[in-house]
Amino acid sequence: MNLSVALSSGDGRSLDGDIVVKLIDVRPDGVQMHVRGDVRPLRYRKGFGSPVPAKDGKKLRVAFTMPDIDHYFLPGHRLMVQVQASWFPLIAFNPQTYLENQYAAAAADYLPVTVGIEAGGSFLSLPVLD
């Protein structure tokens, strides 16, 4: 999956964040079953060896490669894609402010940001087996 996202705070600070993508199997009666999910810390969008802050309001390309899973969607079921900025308590809160060590964040470092997803620059590619 590839997403085009932009973080904005309105105050020009260096930003950070997490993008969580979940694939959901939705039954015809509306019941949802989590199939697969993954998180991408935006600071590591260029590789885990080189953290990079996000610039306020600048669009970022974020690529997800989720591990394969053997799941069969029954007739009448739908695929739901959820994109969110937190998966707490499974993943620690991200302060949204770029810090060298986000686990040493002070209360004042936790500031709101707006996460925008550009539909035209985002796509989902799934393998389909017969």
Residue ranges and their predicted role:
Residues 1-130:
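Glycine/threonine-rich phosphate-binding loop and adjacent beta-strand/alpha-helix elements that clamp
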